Each structure stands twice: as C-alpha cells, then as structure tokens.
From Swiss-Prot:
Residues 427-583 form the Exonuclease domain. Its EC number is 2.7.7.7. This is DNA polymerase III PolC-type. Belongs to the DNA polymerase type-C family. PolC subfamily. One of its GO terms (cellular component) is cytoplasm. SMART domains: EXOIII (SM00479), POLIIIAc (SM00481). The gene is polC.
C-alpha cells in the first residue's frame, strides 16, 4: 500500500481489518483529477485484484461521505492486476452496477437488475427474457454496463444476451395477470365512485350513458361504429392499434397553425385509469371551429388510431371522430332542508395535505344545495379571505375554523404526587407489552416490573398473558414474544390482581407512563378492579426536562447514552429493568443539579416553562361563532406561530382557554384526544375529556380504515364499535355528535393527487411512517377523504340505523351551522394609520413646492390640477399614504440615495411636488428657475417636456427649465379619484433595509409587518413528485398521465414567505388582529420581521401597504455620484451625446463591428437587453418621448410583437404614433375629441386585455365614437390585440434613471464601467476578463456556439452579458487588471488610471465573508505563505490554487509540503 493511499484511508477512516486485508496490500493511487469549478475529484486506484463486494461498498460509501462533508463530489475507478470471473463475484458486481448512474435508469434497472449472469468463452452472458433481448437495450444500455464493470476493475468486457424461454413465459404470464388485475381495479374504482348515484339518479335524456366496460366483447364490438363502440380504458393501450374509442376529460389543449395554414390541436385526456395524448388536424379555420368542443374540462368521446408520435416517441391517438358527452356528476339527492353541513374540510392551504381551492369547495357545497360549509385547514386560516368572498357570491354560509394542534402547557413528570422523600421511596418500575396501541382493541401479553429501593432491585414481577388468539407477525417482530412464550400463561385477571398486590406502597414508574398506565387502567376497569391511584413517575418526561439538550429521549437512546444494558428492547422484563437503572441516574442528577429531593418538586421545580415543545399534539377543530371569536381566532393563530411554534404551530390549552370567547370546539379526527381516549383508555376517560368540547366528531368508517392496517382497530366491525362508543361518549357528556367528512379533495378519483403530495414528504413525516420492517414495509394507506354528499354520508353510517344516522349526519350538523353568526373576515373599507395633521402637511408641502417652482399665484393649469388631486387625496383619506411615502423617500434622500418611482404614482402631480417621484405629469412646459414664468404646450404636439428646444425665459433671459410628461391623474386613482393609491418605490438595494426600519420608526413595531406570501407547489415541482412516486412505489406512468398527475398535485401550499419589499402598516388606533393573524416567514422563528398571515393581496384594500423595493439603479447612481462628485439631479435629460447612443456607436469611439452591436445600448438599464436593442435598431428613437414609447412597448404584452412592430414595418404608423403606454390612449383620444370619461374607459378596457371580452354592443359604441372623431382603423385594431400595458409614469421614471447612467458611459466611461461591474454584473471569469481582447472574444464565441446548440448554462449566459461590457471597455482603450492580493477591495472594483482592479468577490467561489477576511488579514501583515493565506485569510485550498494559477500569488511558498487531502480535513 502506497503512502498516499494509506493517507487517504486514514482520512476516510477505513476499517483496519479491511486495510490489512490482502486486497489492499499493493493498493495505490494512480492519478487524481481535481476539477476546481465543479468541485469534482476523480480517483484512479490500482489493486492487485477485484475487491470483495463488501470491501468495495465500504470504500465507496466512506469515500463519498467523507468528501461530501467538504462539499466535494467524488468518483473513482479501479484497475485490477488480476480479475476473478467467478459467478458469485460477477453476479454481486453485476447487481451493484444498477446502483450507479447511468445504469440505475428505471427501465434498465427494473428489466435487468435481477437477471442471472455467467462468464463463458470470454464473455459475460446475461440470461434474459425475450422481450428485453432487443436492440434498444443492446444499443442504449449495455454499453453503460460495460463501462461500469470496467470501473469496478473487470476491464473491458464483452457482454451478450441469450433469451431464456422459460423466464419469458413466466414473466409474460405474470405481466398479463397483473395487467388484468390493474384494469379490473381501475374499472372497479370507477364503478364504486358512481354506484350509489347510478342507483338513485333519474335518467338524463341528453346524457351519454355511463360506459359498460365489457372487455371480453371489446374486439367483437370495435367495428360496430362510433356511436355504439365499446369504450377502451386508456390503461389497456400499450401498442399501436386502430379504431380505438376513448371517453374522458380534456385536461390540456394546445392549438398550433402550420406554415401551410393547417391547424393542429394537441390535447390530452384522462379517463382516470390513465391518460393519453391526442391529435386532431383541421385543414382550415372553418374546420377548426367545428372542434371548439375540444377545450379544457370538456368530456369527450373520441375515436382514432393509436400511433407512435415521431417527435415525442410516445403513443398518441390521431383523432378521426370526436363528440362532446355529458358526464354523470355526483349530486346530493336528499330533498331541500334535509341536506347535511360539512364541518371538517381542508383546502389547498393545508400544507402538503389537501387539494381543493376554497372556491371549489364552496362552489361544490352550493351546487349540492348545502346551506353552509366549514373550512378547517391545518393550523392556519389562510383560506379565510377567499372563502369569505366566495361564500357571499355563492349565497352560502361559510363557517370559519381550523384544525389546531393542542398541547398541554406543562406536561407533568409525576401523576398523583404526594409529599414523599424520593431517596427513601420504594419504586415499582414496570413495562407492558401489548398486541397494539389501543387499550380497548388490543391485548396485554406481558407485564414485568422491578421493585427497587435506593437503586437496588429487591423483587421482580414477570408474567406473560395469553390473549386467546395467535400473535401477529408484526407483534412478534417488534417484541420478540412468540405464541410459545404465552403457552400455559395465567389468566389476565389473575395477573392483574397479582400485579396490584406487587405495587402496593410504591411509586409506579414507567417510560411514557401515559401509555402503560392507560393500558393498565383500561384492563383494571374491564375486570372491575380499582384503577391506579398511587403516584406515578414518567421517566420519558423526567428525561425531557432534566436533559433538554438531548434530541432523543426514547428508552433505546437513553440506555446507550448512560451505558445501561438493554439486551432485548420491547420485552417488558428487560425494558423495566433498564428503566429502573435510568430512574436512579435521573434522581441523582436531579438532586445534585436542581436540588430535587421531594416527589412534589418534580412538577413544580423541574418541569420547564417550554415543556409544551415536547408535549404530544392532539388535534381539535375550532370554529368562529361571532366577530369576537374571529379576533380570538386570529390571536390564537398568531400566538401558535410566533410564541409557541415548535415544528408546527402549537396552542397550549391555557392559551386556548384565555381566548375561547366566541369560539366553538370539536373533537376532530382520530388524532383528537377524545378519540384517542376511546381507543386507549375507555369510555369513562373519554367522557371526562369530552366535557371540554362543544361537540363530538365522528367520521365515515372509511376515514378510520388506516387504523385497521396499523392494528389499532381489528376490523370494520371494530371501527363501527368505536363510532358507537363515541356516540355514547356524547350522550354521557351531553354533547351533540356530528358526522364530518374530513375532506381533503372533492372527487374520489382525486385521491391519487393527495397520495403523491403526501408521499413526497418522505418517511420522516408521521403520516408516511411504515408498518412492519424490512423491504416490504409500506406506509398505511391514506383514507378515502373526498367530499361526500348527504346520501353518501347516510350510507356510510347506515349501520347506526336510519334515525340515528340522520340525526348525526343531517340534523346535528344543521343545528350547529345555525349557531354560527355571519362574520366580516375582510373589512369593506380602507383603514389608514393616523399621522397628526397629515392632510394639512400634504397640502402645505404641495403648495410650498409649487410656489417655489411656478410662482405665487400659480398658473391656472397648475392650480386646477393641484385642487383636483388634493380634493381626491384628502377627501378619501389618502393623505397619510402620500405623507408616509414622502417621509420614507426624504429619509433615503438624506442618506444620499435617489429613490425611483414605480407604477403610476408619477401620474400624480401632488406626488411630484412633495418629493415622492421625479416624474412630472403636467403637459410639456417651460418654467423659469428665476422668475417662475412658464409656458405649457397642451395640444398634444409634444410628447415630453424634455424634448422641447432650449430657449431663454422671455421675461428675464434665464435659460428655461423643461419638464412635463402629459399623464392624466385618472390613471393613478381612477376616474373618480377614489381608487386606493398603490405607491411603489425603488430604493437602493443598499438602503432598502434602512428604509424598512424607517417604517417601524414612523409607525411603531407593533403596527408594521412584512407583507406575507404563500408558496404553493409549482407544476415543475409536482412533476418531480410524480416521478419520485413512480420510483418509490414501483409505478410506471405514460407521459400524459405524468402530466395529468402533476397538474392535479400542483397548487398545494408548501411554505410561506414575504414580499421582497412590501410592508403592511396597521392603523395605530386598531390592532393587527382586526385584519389578519401574524407569523414568521417560512416558520423561521429567528426572522427579524413578522409577516401578515394572510397573503397581502387579500387585505391590500383594507390597510396601507408600502412597496419598498430594492433596485440596482439608485445604487448605481449613488456609486457614480461617489466616484464623480456629480449630482445626478443636474444631469440633463436631453444630452446629445447620450441620445447619440441610440443611433450608433461613434460617440463611444468604436465601430459596431468592434462591440458586436450597431448602437451603444450595452449595459444601459431598460435598453440593454437583446430584445430592446433589436427594437432600437428597428425604430431609431431620437427623443425622450420615443424612449418612453419603447419602454412601454417592451414591457407590454402583445403591444409590440404582432402589433406596433408590424405597423411600423409596413409604414402605417411611426414610433411616435403607435400605442406605447396605457396613458397615451386616454390622452390621444381626448385630443381627438372623445369625452374624458369614455377615453378613460377605453384605456382601462384595452390595458387589461378586455377589449375583445366586453360585449359587442359596448365595443361597437366605443368604435363608433372613435371613428366619429377620426381615430384611424389601424389604431382601433391595435387596441384589440393588447393584453397588458405599461404605465407611462413608470416608463418615465425608468428612462430618466437610464439616461443618467448612460451619461456616465458617454462622458465618464471608466467610472461607468467600475460602477457596472461592482453592482450590475452577475458573473465573472477573471482569467478571461484580464486576459485581453483575444481571450474575451474567444470566450464569447465559445458561449455563442453553445447557445446555438442550447448547451449554454445560466452562468454562461450571465457571463456573456458581462463579457460584452468587458469587450466594449477594452475596445474603448481601457484595461482590465488582475486581482491584486494587496490592492483589490473585498467587494468593489477599483479605478487605477485607465485600469479597473477587480475585487476578491469577483473570483468564482470566493464569498463576501472570505473576501472581507482576506482584506482584514492583509492589514495585519503580509501573507508569507499559501498556508498562512489559508489560515489567516480563510481561503480554501481550491481558491488558493486558483489564485496561484492566475499569477496573483507570485512566488509565494507553500510553507510546508502538505498532502492533497490535508487541506480539506
């Protein structure tokens, strides 16, 4: 073994016995290839022989695991001097190959991994079934197997396959059998879902009869014609076939038009056995219209041929005939007034657990004629706002609730404690073994105990009990107890009496005592024996409170930690003795560390205040009864998320009690404490608990079915008995019993979507805990939790008898709904915070600035505009919104940053005057800065005041200032001026955190919250879930079915977050719970801000929301100001040099060929993208107004492409006259002669893409008015194509910032490039950037080629953008220097004459913290060696190596010779 190899083995801690084996005797490392960018290391090993398979796996796992800890990926291969081709070794390595990519592909692994291999005639022979012995596997997969075996050390093998006829027949038989079973199950599921409906539903004449799946006659009937053809389940189709007929629902449609004018409709259908891709061709528009019925959600019958699509390589139906059919939907058939109310329903806001939107849930209930429905999501109320609005629209009562996680505040260590010296007490430490977790449905099979005094065992008890039936395999596997152990055991009652005698005058002790004591008490009660009344100590809670730093407090982990013997865990005698040994360790530590000497002290002095964090969660349903209850609900949700969050939101019982007014409580599901008590403790215990609640919930037996699989309940009869017991509990406790459905999806066929979502959580989720052990272990099936009709629920509870079933299903649920009052979840008005004298301040600031600019008295046009705006702003209570925005902008300005405006706030002249925006919305005008004389151009002949020619004031000769963008106020606050203002502001990214804190400072911490968001499962993520489900559960879906399942699983809540800049301000005369609960984003309890629990859009018309966004433009401007000393406000908007950038490159001193683009737009905000540069090349803008047009055209949808672009190309219109920004429509139409109200309405219809969606009568009225005022037809047609338009004020703010940046590019280029690379560039490659023009152009060409082949990565695309600017900079005569260990800054680029010095952060892989550490370390002294740079500077070996390669370190010595591995370990 070489020294280098031995060193590696030390690092990965390879076991000594393996290292000393003959296999490792001559081991060596031939080569190590280190890929620094991808952090991949390739090892090439040499061994004397192929390793034993166990040794190989150990080497593989340790090598991977060790390097993963250093964030390094590892691969390795082996060269073996001698190769052993024995069958056993080959077979082992053959199977190992399928654990490595790419041999682990699903199709290859499932088909080949279990086949037998032999080595004959210098070949590896695979005995395979005939159907896999084909060219596909030979050509696509066997070469990968050859490579993998070579990597194992077998050299290059020749592999051949031979067909095994016996295996072929066997597998074919199994396949046919399983396929038939699958088809049978699919059909049966379909029939069951419609069974009750078909029995009771009156015939619908126009409806197509439900298909009768008689598959044996299918072949005979196939030719009978489209109308009478047998319907084929999609799951049956596996090969190309002709004249197949499907019936199903369309879930995806895409229409395309070919170059020849033919149309193709690609669509996907499902019949819920599987899904299929289909195609239908139409020769022209007229034929295409015949197939309008092919629409998403439609139910169709289609006939066609099944063929392999040459592009997708999947089976596709080429449709020949298609017909719309009527689907028999489930209906609630009970008469009016006799329909149930669902009181336990989850929406897609139940995190990763339920599917329906609250709208679809409410719509279904309303469609069925239900008078109310409850919403009870898990631990949140995020569906409340949408539910509130939808219920009001649907005319149905929404009952607002949630399914809460209830915990005890302090979980006691001791039950029934008395005044007793712990040191002098006698303890009976006991444990029971049972056949399951339910004391009512499972049996005791062993009771064992150790009586202990002062740490010594003084007596023992150990008795088996025969339950009267054979033990299940699971019980035997878990406990180690077999039927043999139980032979000859004493009767249960005898053992119980003996154990009671054994326990006298002792403190009982058990680990998780609530279970053991509960089981014992249930059995005592059953045999008329007294329950336990003596003190009990629970060592589980004892450990949790005594050792809170431990993550696990189970008996196994504790015995290991304290070195207590536990030879046979889960046999009662061994567990009891181990628990006793632990008890005395705990007592000693409690006495020495906490002074605990008396039994009473355990609960008073040791139980921690936060013991609720470890308490067992029990579910309860909580319902809002009135408006007081709604606020209390919001408080409970907030407290559970903010103060009591631990893994999930928790509500301690005392907290619930303190906020219970206006709330009603239900006992929830099988995870509720009453249900649990019925199972584990008996009816009496359940009755005591039930008195806490307002009603008892029972659910359909199907909901409880998983408990049978988990052996908590024996069978269906057991489930029905539990339900009867719950009814008895309600009777004794005098609480109504209500049947609820625990709805998680609407239709039975949607069960698979929930299955996929839930299983994606992995086995760490409680719901996915497996039953049994070993490879066959599977999680319990999920219950059938669809939304049931009244008749379906009555059928579920028919075993109770007709009258009782009706009472719990219908009468009691209706009575409960009647107890619920209507509440206002979302307020109808805007509630702004109060700022003293806000109205007076806004008016005063407005006039003060207006007088300063335009003089006093004001010009009429200014005076009237201010009066109009202030009337609206002050009259509607919007002054505080304006003033708050002004205060924030002013504070940022005082810190040295400009603030850019977004959206339409620049449409408000008042906003301009008080400093919220730089955009002046008045008509283009001149104004004298000396005497305030002004001239306004109001005829629409000038698009922007910045485009007016320069001229002096005619009164005093001072050069005029120019301004005005001609934007009507109506585009901000609506025609009537009463729309809630949405003021969005772009702060510097550097100053954004300070601006956020300003909000808190102005309004107070308790009134300012980040705007909350809800993150749901995206379709791409859902697609991954489906593929994972396929892999983990042995499923194989065709592509269309994967798409269907992914669409069905998408949209479920996954997490929460916060808007990047949104701050919600609660009025200071109310509190946040009047509007929304609060929480931390993504459940991060360390976050510095709390967020609204509701998505901020749900309440944005009720409270003030400030959009304080971070943006690069203000940061860039600040950087340029710092570098140049130039105040950006003084930069003219009509600088000729800047405008020259839009027409050529001459102003930059380069040719288009040098920089690869005909204009100077590279790196200019708004105009630097390829798309906008192309627009500039086509339109040649020369004025500010035309730049505004370009900004609007580039940001709109269907405004440029297929619209304005064609009009300009065809010479019909110009850049100046096409529709660019939304506001231009209103201004243009008013200048044309239309009434302002109509002009405004047309603008609103067009900008929202509604022009073609309004009624023909309304649209024709507008068109007639436009034509009467000589609006050209092309303009009217252009309006009809638009889907979305950009506000002109937004465009003006962005263009103004862009021109300021461009000014520096023209006049102060080195400063511009310094700022650009410091702030805007996203990717760097310093070796290329400092390598000169040839290196930069070569790398750009390399990326260009990759782009053409769709091979460029996202990083390379970002790098290309950076290199375009580097190339331009170099062509202009500037230089890009190398990283300098002693001159480079940590983060910012530095200017040295005509050269830019890059910062450390520009080196790939070097983060901000390390960059700052290097700068700090160099200030303390020179780096004398690479090792010192690593240690003091914090740079990794990879970074140091990269610096050395780039020549940054010069001749810096290593300091000492280190192995390749020491740098990482």
């Amino acid at each position: 073994m070489s020294d280098l190899f031995a060193k590696l083995m030390d690092q990965i801690e390879m076991p000594l016995d393996m290292r000393r084996s003959s296999a490792f005797s001559s081991a060596d490392i031939i080569e190590v290839k280190v890929h620094s960018v991808s952090r991949l290391w390739e090892f090439h090993f040499a061994f004397a022989a192929v390793l034993p398979i166990a040794t190989y796996r150990e080497l593989h796992d340790r090598l991977i695991r060790t390097f993963e800890a250093a964030d390094i990926k590892v691969t390795f291969d082996i060269q073996a001097a001698q190769v052993d081709y024995s069958d056993d070794l080959l077979q082992a390595y053959y199977q190992e190959a399928f654990e490595h990519a790419p041999c682990n592909s699903a199709s290859f692994k499932s088909s080949f991994s279990k086949l037998k291999v032999t080595y004959e005639d210098d070949k590896l022979i695979i005995a395979a079934p005939g159907f896999v012995n084909n060219d596909h596997f030979r050509n696509n997969h066997l070469p990968n197997l050859v490579k993998q075996l070579e990597a194992f050390g077998f050299g290059i093998l020749t592999i051949d396959m031979v067909s095994d006829q016996e295996m072929t027949e066997h597998l074919t038989k199994n396949f046919v059998s399983s396929r038939q079973a699958l088809v049978k199950k699919a059909v049966q599921d379909n029939l069951e879902a419609q069974k009750s409906l078909e029995a009771m539903m009156p015939p619908v004449e126009e409806a197509t009869p439900a298909p009768k799946f008689d598959y044996k006659e299918r072949a005979a009937k196939r030719q009978a014609g489209f109308e009478k053809a047998t319907i084929t389940p999609m799951i049956e189709i596996e090969t190309e076939e002709n004249r197949i007929v499907f019936e199903g629902m369309v879930f995806d449609v895409e229409r395309k038009t070919t170059r020849t004018g033919r149309h193709i409709i690609n669509f996907k259908m499902t019949d819920y056995t599987s899904s299929f891709a289909l195609q239908k061709w139409a020769k022209d528009d007229e034929e295409l219209r015949k197939f309008d019925m092919i629409a998403k959600g439609a139910w169709l019958r289609v006939q066609g041929n099944i063929e392999t699509n040459p592009f997708t390589k999947s089976l596709t139906m080429n449709v020949q005939q298609v017909k719309e059919i009527v689907r028999h939907e489930r209906k609630d058939l009970m008469p009016e007034g006799q329909k149930r109310v669902e009181l336990h329903a989850h929406t897609n806001m139940s995190t990763m657990d339920a599917l329906p939107t609250v709208e679809s849930l409410i719509d279904t209930a309303a469609k069925w004629g239900h008078k109310a429905i409850a919403i009870t999501d898990h631990a949140n109320v995020q569906s409340f706002p949408h539910g509130y609005h939808r219920a009001r629209k649907a005319g149905i009562k929404a009952i607002f609730g949630l399914e809460a996680n209830i915990v005890e505040d302090k979980v006691p260590i001791s039950y029934e404690p008395v005044d007793m010296d712990l040191h002098e007490a006698t303890y009976v430490v006991f444990d029971v073994e049972t056949t399951g977790l339910s004391a009512m449905n499972n049996d005791l099979i062993q009771i064992a105990a150790s009586k202990m005094f002062k740490g010594n065992i003084v007596e023992q008890f150990d008795e088996f009990i025969d339950p009267g039936h054979p033990l299940s395999a699971f019980t035997t596997e878990l406990t180690g107890i077999t039927d043999k152990h139980l032979q000859g055991a004493k009767p249960l009652v005898t053992v119980l009496k003996a154990f009671q005698d054994f326990c006298k005058d002792s403190i009982l002790v058990a680990h998780n005592a609530s279970f053991d004591v509960g089981f014992m008490n249930a059995n005592y009660e059953r045999h008329d024996l007294p329950k336990i009344t003596q003190p009990v100590i629970d060592t589980l809670e004892f450990a949790r409170n005594l050792y809170p730093e431990y993550k696990r407090h189970g008996l196994g982990p504790l015995t290991k930690r304290f070195q207590v013997s536990l030879d046979h865990h889960h046999m009662a005698n061994y567990d009891a003795e181990a628990t006793g040994r632990l008890l005395f360790i705990f007592l000693k530590d409690a006495r020495e560390k906490h002074g605990i000497k008396n039994l009473l002290q355990l609960n008073t002095d040791l139980v921690a205040e936060d013991s609720y964090k470890k308490a067992r969660i029990k579910h309860a349903t909580i319902y809002v009864q009135n408006q007081v209850g709604l606020k209390n609900m919001f408080k409970l949700v907030s407290l559970s998320n903010i103060k009591y969050f631990e893994g999930v939101p928790r509500i301690p019982r005392t907290v619930l009690d303190a906020h219970r007014e206006g709330l009603l409580l239900g006992t929830a599901c099988s995870d509720g404490e009453v249900f649990d008590a019925v199972l584990t403790k008996g009816i009496d215990a359940a009755v005591d608990l039930a008195r806490y609640y307002d009603f008892i919930e029972i659910m359909p037996p199907a909901i409880y079915q998983p408990l049978v699989v988990r052996e908590l309940i024996k069978d269906q009869a057991g489930i029905e008995q539990v339900i009867r017991d719950l009814i008895e509990v309600g009777k004794r406790a005098k609480k109504p019993v209500l049947a609820t459905g625990n709805v998680h999806y609407l239709e039975p066929e949607e069960e698979i979507y929930r299955e996929i979502i839930v299983r994606s959580l992995g086995q760490g989720a409680m719901i996915n805990r497996t039953i049994g052990r070993g490879e066959g272990a599977q999680p319990a099936p999920l219950p059938k939790a669809h939304f049931r009709t009244t008749n379906e629920m009555l059928d579920e509870f028919a075993f109770l008898g007709k009258d009782l079933a009706y009472q719990v299903v219908v009468q009691n649920t209706q009575d409960f709904a009647d107890r619920i009052e209507e509440v206002e979840v979302v307020k109808g008005d805007l509630y702004t915070p109060y700022i003293d004298k806000a109205e007076e301040t806004v008016a005063e600031l407005t006039y003060q600035k207006a007088f300063e600019i335009y003089g006093n008295p004001l010009p009429d046009i200014i005076d009237l505009r201010i009066e109009k705006e202030l009337t609206s702003i002050l009259g509607n209570g919007f002054a505080v919104i304006y003033l708050a925005s002004q205060m924030l902008v002013n504070r940022s300005n005082e810190r040295g940053y400009l603030v850019g405006s977004r959206g339409s706030v620049g449409s408000s002249f008042v906003a301009t005057m008080i400093g919220i925006t730089e955009v002046n919305p008045m008509p283009p005008h001149y104004v004298c800065p000396s005497c305030q004389h002004s001239e306004f151009i109001t005829d629409g002949s000038v698009g922007s005041g910045y485009d007016l020619p320069n001229k002096p004031c005619p009164k005093c000769g001072t050069p005029y200032q120019k301004d005005g963008q001609d934007i009507p106020f109506e585009t901000f606050l609506g025609f009537d001026g009463d729309k809630v203002p949405d003021i969005d502001l772009n702060f510097s990214g550097d100053d954004q955190p300070s601006a956020h804190l300003d909000v808190r400072d102005i309004f107070g911490d308790e009134y300012a919250f980040r705007a909350g968001t809800v993150g749901t499962v995206a379709e791409k993520t859902a697609y991954g879930f489906v593929k994972g489900y396929e892999r983990d559960y042995g499923k194989f879906y065709r592509d269309a079915e994967v798409d269907r399942l992914a669409a069905g699983a998408a949209g479920v809540k996954r997490t929460t977050g916060q808007h990047p800049g949104g701050i919600v301000v609660i009025p200071n005369y109310m509190d946040v719970y009047d509007f929304t609960p609060v929480q931390y984003p993504a459940d991060d309890v360390t976050a510095s801000w709390q967020t609204t629990h509701f998505n901020f859009h749900d309440i944005d018309e009720n409270v003030l929301k400030l959009d304080i966004l971070g943006h690069d433009d203000p940061t860039m401007i600040r950087k340029l100001q710092d570098l140049s000393g130039i105040d950006p406000i003084t930069i003219p908007a009509d600088d000729p040099g800047v405008m020259a950038l839009f027409s050529g490159t001459e102003v930059l001193g380069v040719t288009p060929e040098q920089i690869g683009t005909p204009t100077g737009m590279l790196g200019i905000p708004e105009f630097g993208t390829n798309f906008v540069r192309g627009m500039v090349n086509e339109t040649h803008p020369t004025t500010f107004a035309e730049l505004l047009q370009l900004s609007g055209l580039s940001h709109g949808t269907d405004v440029w492409l297929g619209n304005a672009q064609d009009l300009i190309k065809e010479g019909i219109a110009t850049l100046k006259t096409v529709i660019g920004c939304r506001d231009d429509i209103m201004v243009y139409l008013m200048h044309a002669g239309l009434e302002p109200k109509m002009a405004f309405t047309i603008m609103e219809r067009v900008r929202k893409g509604l022009w073609l969606k309004i009624s023909e009568e309304e649209r024709n009225g507008y068109i007639d008015a436009m034509r009467e005022n000589n609006v050209p037809d092309w303009y009217i047609e252009s309006c009809g194509k638009i889907k979305y338009m950009f506000p002109k004020a937004h465009a003006a703010a962005y263009v103004l910032m862009a021109l300021r940046v461009a000014y520096f590019k023209v006049h102060h280029p080195i400063m511009y490039y310094c700022a650009y690379f410091s702030i805007r560039a996203k990717a760097f490659e310093l070796k290329t950037m400092s390598g000169g023009l040839d290196a930069v152009k070569a790398r750009m060409e390399d990326i260009t080629i990759k782009r053409k082949n769709n091979e460029a990565t996202n990083v390379e695309n970002d790098l290309f953008t950076t290199l375009e600017i580097v190339n331009e900079m170099l062509e202009r005569g500037f230089k890009f220097g190398k990283l300098d260990l002693y001159k480079s800054d940590a983060i910012e680029f530095q200017i040295k004459g005509d050269t830019l010095i890059p910062p450390f952060i520009a080196l790939e892989g070097l983060g901000e913290n390390v960059a700052k550490q290097i700068v700090k370390a160099r200030q303390e002294g020179e780096f004398l060696s690479k090792m010192e740079l690593r240690k003091r500077g914090g740079a990794s070996s990879t970074l140091v190596e990269k610096m050395d390669e780039m020549g940054i370190l010069g001749n810096m010595p290593e300091d000492n010779q280190l192995s390749l591995f020491d740098d990482f370990f």
